[in-house]
Amino acid sequence: MKFTKTNDLRDAYLKFFESKDHLKLESFSLVPQNDKSLLLINAGMAPLKPYFTGLQEPPKKRITTCQKCVRTGDIDNVGITSRHGTFFEMLGNFSFGDYFKKEIIPWAWEFLTGVLELPKEKLYVTIYLDDDEAYEYWTTLTDVDKTHIFRLGKEDNFWEHGAGPCGPCTEIHFSRTDEVPTNSEKFVELSDEDKIIEVWNLVFTQFDGDGKGNYEKLASTNIDTGMGLERLAVVMQNKNSIFEIDTLENILKEVGNLANVKYGEDNKIDVSLRIITDHIRSITFMISDDIMPSNEGRGYVLRRLLRRAARHGKTLGIKDAFLCNLCDVVIRDCGSAYSDLEAKKDYIKKVIKIEEDKFRETLDSGMEILNNLISELKENNEKVLKGADGFKLYDTFGFPMELTKEILEDEDLSLDEDGFHKEMKEQRERARSARKTSNYMGTDVKTLDVISGEIETTFDGYENDSLIAEVKTLVNGEDFTNSIIEGNNAVVVTDVTPFYAEMGGQIGDTGTIYNDNFKGKVLDTKKNIGGKIIHFVEAISGELKVGDKVKLEVDNARRENIKRNHTATHLLDAALVKVLGSHVHQAGSYVSADRLRFDFSHFEGVKEEELLKVEQLVNEAIMSVTPVNTTEMDLQEAKNSGAVGIFDDKYAEKVRVVCAGEYSKELCGGTHIDNTGKIGLFKIISENGIAAGTRRIEAVTGIEAYKWVNEKAELLKHISGKLKCSEKEITIKLDQQSKEIKEKEKEITNLKSKFASMEINDIINSVKDVKGINVVTYALTDVDGEALRGLCEKVRDKVNNSLTLLTSSIDGKVVICAMADKEAVSKGAHCGKVIKEAATILGGGGGGRPDMAQAGGKLPEKISDALDSVYKIVETLVK
């Protein structure tokens, strides 16, 4: 056979269809674009759905791809069998209203028998029961043996997914047996035994089905084919499973080397080897597509795969984190086809390392608890772990439910999944209840949520900061009312408003509401569940009635500051992507008049030099004095234009796109300045982590940034005055003083040790004989732990057959140290047990070895009682 290596097979396929006038497209991201029905791309045609449905025009009517895919529906079988996997590459060629059966059938035969040189006598074809057209083309346009063609029913050879485009398919199979099927029943039997395996599926999309068995011919027919690259490699390399083909075998061998085991010698070991081999491929490709480990969605899938692989590595005896280096094999073998793997190599390795280290930290603790629970189950002859116990492992140690299930299954046990989900639901309810408020600014929230759906409230504040409106509804406390008077705190709903309601992280506007008979302050603006804009108003004077005309005026100075901060978050978002990478996505924001807060996905703390670069980029955009334009367009048009958005959110068909020149382009309904220069200055004041994989930046702009800089300048001036140096010399002066302080502290410590050593004779003279052991106890003051340990060593060396316990009170706390020589230990003395009891009396804890132990306490007034207890404890221990 001409081609056998996996990479060569991929190239041969794509080149073949390029020769048939197909446009070769690079693999799409594993993250579906504009398709909420999928968590991850799981088929070759999945990214091409818009072309098949007519929503988008394909770049060409003939396309060929090799699409990376991840499927986790069979994850529990991965490793258990040798044919299941989560990651695979799907070769495909597609026609959008161009060629059909007459062309693709002979092309498929040409590729398999001509290019790949597969023996024709080993190839079998299945067609749909009634597809005479396909049969005709197979028998007239190829030289396939007619006795190798079998007609099968709908479940085998008709592609249909609910209502919509569908059609028959023809599949090409390869025989790995000398048995020759003479009828369709025997063919199916051999297929079920994996003696004949499917290689290529050609789908003929020619009908529009209603999902009830009724079909109409489509005006335009399509071709959708799929051939798994790994399965093709199994055939071409004459292997028994995907784990034996070149690319996967390289990974598997590397894992075996790390664990010092061989594949094929032990079934349990083989399972772990296969799981790691498969999962590292999914992990590597998912991270390269900017998926981050998390507890939700596709991030959870990644975390689950990574933790499952890490646990099986530990099962194999691999002590240290290894997945971050194992991905090198994937990148080396697949890098020629997926160039972004090499480009993102360091990033991929770093994300894996951080996540694996984090999991290994908790794995030991969690496994200890789970092993204890397993032991209890077995002792009690029980088979099911309580859901509450499983949830505690998830909540405390980050054990995914699936991981706990898998470990239990290894022990022939199971998890009460209903109980687990019940605990999860109750925790979410508690969190939701904690977030709820029944009252806001004196108004019952439930009352606000039932404001009539007939009332229309329109926001008209992008261009206006004041306008005339009609009062439609008034709410005073829990009650709807027809009027409010001076002193009332109430909700006012008008037919139109210039006030922006809190949304998308931007706080609501404030201002005034008035007419000839009434004056009030608008303290806040929000939306209720029904989307009505509601003003929280403090009535200052007069009376306001339903139906009154009022003037609404926004506090424009405050709004301008909000606009500065909101536009700055857009510039910050773009700068973070540029500096940290395309994996950065907005995870939340808060935009007020005096500051901004921006949450984003990132796997580690942002380095100081990275923060400085981000800040510099934002200020460069500000100083460029770039116009900020807002445009309303169709959602799809906005996406196609490259506008950034949180596309998991629900958007209307018409959206606003805010564009700051070449610096930023985002979908946004908030208010913005019309020129970046109006931001004035941007200053980051903090950066920290708020959750695993999520960071937060807080910043100020405009006058607040000026104030912040001024405060720091005054502080530097004050510090330089105290240090009697220039501001430039502050760090030098502080380094000098820090060095001097450390030297003085060292001198003090040495002096304390000398003074303590002077008491050595007094300490030794406190010795008492307890059942043949010399027990020494003594209380000191202001001696640190290191010095106390040194004194214990001196006493031990001077007093034979001894156990010594010394305490020292420092700053209201107690340090304890105990030591025993070999002779005392041989008689039963145990420092760890002695010090544990003594520390308990002192309100602390600790422990250690028989010959040495340390502890701490917080009750210095109990030192005398603790020392007295030592004699009793030793007496119980000595043989």
Swiss-Prot record:
Residues given in the record as Zn(2+) binding sites: 566, 570, 668, 672
Enzyme class: ligase
Reactions catalysed: tRNA(Ala) + L-alanine + ATP = L-alanyl-tRNA(Ala) + AMP + diphosphate
Gene3D superfamilies linked to this entry: 2.40.30.130, 3.10.310.40, 3.30.54.20, 6.10.250.550, Bira Bifunctional Protein, Domain 2, Threonyl-trna Synthetase, Chain A, domain 2
SUPFAM superfamilies from the UniProt entry: Class II aaRS and biotin synthetases (SSF55681), Putative anticodon-binding domain of alanyl-tRNA synthetase (AlaRS) (SSF101353), ThrRS/AlaRS common domain (SSF55186), Translation proteins (SSF50447)
Cofactor note: Binds 1 zinc ion per subunit.
Keyword tRNA-binding among UniProt keywords: yes
Highest taxon listed in the record's lineage: Bacteria
EC number, as in UniProt: 6.1.1.7
Matching InterPro entries: aa-tRNA-synth_II/BPL/LPL, Ala-tRNA-lgiase_IIc, Ala-tRNA-ligase_IIc_anticod-bd, Ala-tRNA-synth_IIc_core, Ala-tRNA-synth_IIc_N, Ala-tRNA_ligase, Ala_tRNA_ligase_euk/bac, DHHA1_dom
Subcellular location(s) of the protein: Cytoplasm
Cofactor(s) the record lists: Zn(2+)
Predominant cellular place of this UniProt entry's protein: cytoplasm
GO cellular component: cytosol
Keyword terms of this UniProt record: Aminoacyl-tRNA synthetase, ATP-binding, Cytoplasm, Ligase, Metal-binding, Nucleotide-binding, Protein biosynthesis, RNA-binding, tRNA-binding, Zinc
Single GO term (MF): aminoacyl-tRNA deacylase activity
Gene Ontology BP terms: alanyl-tRNA aminoacylation
Free-text comment on this protein's domains from its UniProt entry: Consists of three domains; the N-terminal catalytic domain, the editing domain and the C-terminal C-Ala domain. The editing domain removes incorrectly charged amino acids, while the C-Ala domain, along with tRNA(Ala), serves as a bridge to cooperatively bring together the editing and aminoacylation centers thus stimulating deacylation of misacylated tRNAs.
Functional summary from the UniProt entry: Catalyzes the attachment of alanine to tRNA(Ala) in a two-step reaction: alanine is first activated by ATP to form Ala-AMP and then transferred to the acceptor end of tRNA(Ala). Also edits incorrectly charged Ser-tRNA(Ala) and Gly-tRNA(Ala) via its editing domain.
Family indicated by similarity: Belongs to the class-II aminoacyl-tRNA synthetase family.
NCBIfam families noted in UniProt: alaS
Listed name of the protein: Alanine--tRNA ligase
